[in-house]
Design a protein with these regions (language model features):
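C-terminal extensions
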Residues: 1-13, 17-86
Length: 86
C-alpha cells in the first residue's frame, strides 16, 4: 500500500485513513480514479471485497468522493457526505 496515495485520498472531505484504505482495497490508486465512476458500483465492490454488508453511509461517502473527483469547483454543501443520502 502506498502511503502517498492514502494521503491523497484523505484530501477528499469525509475520507480518513480507514476509508482511504477501503478505496485502495477495491483497486483505486488516485483521486482521479474516482472521476465519473458509479458510486453504487464502488459500494457493491466494497461489499464484495469485505464479504459483508457495508453500512449505507459508505455509499454516501462514495457519492461525495465521486463528486469531488469529477468537478473542479465544489459546492461546500455537497462536500458533506451526509448531504448525499437517498
Amino acid at each position: 500500500m502506498n502511503k502517498a496515495i492514502i494521503k491523497e485520498f484523505q484530501q477528499i472531505p469525509g475520507v480518513g485513513k480507514i476509508i482511504a484504505n477501503d478505496f485502495w482495497n477495491i483497486g483505486l490508486r488516485s483521486v482521479s480514479d474516482l472521476k465519473d465512476k458509479s458510486p453504487e458500483d464502488l459500494y457493491w465492490k466494497l461489499c464484495q471485497y469485505q464479504h459483508a454488508h457495508v453500512d449505507r453511509c459508505m455509499l454516501y461517502v462514495f457519492r461525495c468522493a465521486v463528486y469531488y473527483a469529477s468537478n473542479e469547483t465544489h459546492d461546500p454543501e455537497l462536500l458533506k457526505w451526509w448531504n448525499w443520502k437517498d
